[in-house]
Amino acid sequence: MAPNLRKSHPLLKMINNSLIDLPTPSNISAWWNFGSLLGICLATQILTGLLLAAHYTADTTLAFSSVAHTCRNVQYGWLIRNLHANGASFFFICIYLHIGRGLYYGSYLYKETWNTGVILLLTLMATAFVGYVLPWGQMSFWGATVITNLFSAVPYIGQTLVEWAWGGFSVDNPTLTRFFTLHFLLPFMIMGLTLIHLTFLHESGSNNPLGIVSNCDKIPFHPYFSLKDTLGFMFMLLPLMTLALFSPNLLGDPENFTPANPLVTPPHIKPEWYFLFAYAILRSIPNKLGGVLALAASVLILFLAPLLHKSKQRTMTFRPLFQLLFWTLTANLLILTWVGSQPVEHPFIIIGQLASLTYFTILLILFPIIGALENKMLNY
């Protein structure tokens, strides 16, 4: 009998073991779709980004007009740009849901997979930030100024660090050039990290909604989950196309229709919606260094998830107390996102401070306490 090329060829064998004959738990739900959706997002962003980069000029005098030229004169340039800008939003929606799934079902106990995932999130955030600066509109410029300025909070070397990042004494042409370089480079780094992430995942196999070992009940990934994932793609591509074609500027900032002007500060400087929760935490602390540390901690706290797991059960499926805590955390993040978009005025300041405090309290204090308490209640 002739050997099956899919299983014997050195390259095809790897693809086969990752996407075709991969043994998968039979009971994983639609929440396990987001990994492959993130892969689709990455591929779409790299493709549209490559086409945009072909028409973009990384120079302060030309950047804004080169983006306008792409939208007006390049064949389907408007569509490519709208897909790229809104694709970033969908990338973040998917990654946040993917992380939420990981927290809910205890997937963070696969420590290597989880840690590479958090590094992926940080790289994605960096990529999105430098990408937002490239159109060189008002919010691009002032967003870059405000966020890079945070490095000056680092004791002793802060100011040097900022000037080194800027390539001068303010955000200017060198800054734009290096941000374009980084924005081009980082997605390929994300691709590499994704492969590492998948390698670690396939070492242990997927988790499942019950959080129990499922070796006795595995099914091949193709055709079952490849088909299920295709449905997920449809569900993501439909709203993405709707957004890109009907209201492409819904999630953008109107300030970005004005070319960057260092002499005029916009009334409200705020990042894209997917960074608002972290921005709210940054703003809620009146001290600069404290704010920067809280901002970093808001994301880096994910590294601690495996250490804060005290329950004998892996998932939250059969833990109502923990579920209550999880959905409180979700609501809290939505409140932080909303507060981040509001001006720094009376009710919003205190709401932001309370929401920030609640965020860290739930993750650092209540998660381990409730986990231990549930063990007691179940006589574990």
UniProtKB/Swiss-Prot annotation:
Q: What keywords sit in the KW lines?
A: Electron transport, Heme, Iron, Membrane, Metal-binding, Mitochondrion, Mitochondrion inner membrane, Respiratory chain, Transmembrane, Transmembrane helix, Transport, Ubiquinone
Note accompanying the cofactor annotation: Binds 2 heme b groups non-covalently.
Tell me which residues bind heme b b566. H98, H197
| Organism superkingdom | Eukaryota
Q: Identify the cofactor(s).
A: heme b
The residues listed in the UniProt record as binding heme b b562, with positions renumbered to this chain, are H84, H183
Please share what else the UniProt entry notes about this protein: Heme 1 (or BL or b562) is low-potential and absorbs at about 562 nm, and heme 2 (or BH or b566) is high-potential and absorbs at about 566 nm.
Q: What is the designated name of this protein?
A: Cytochrome b
Species per Swiss-Prot/TrEMBL record = Grus nigricollis (Black-necked crane)
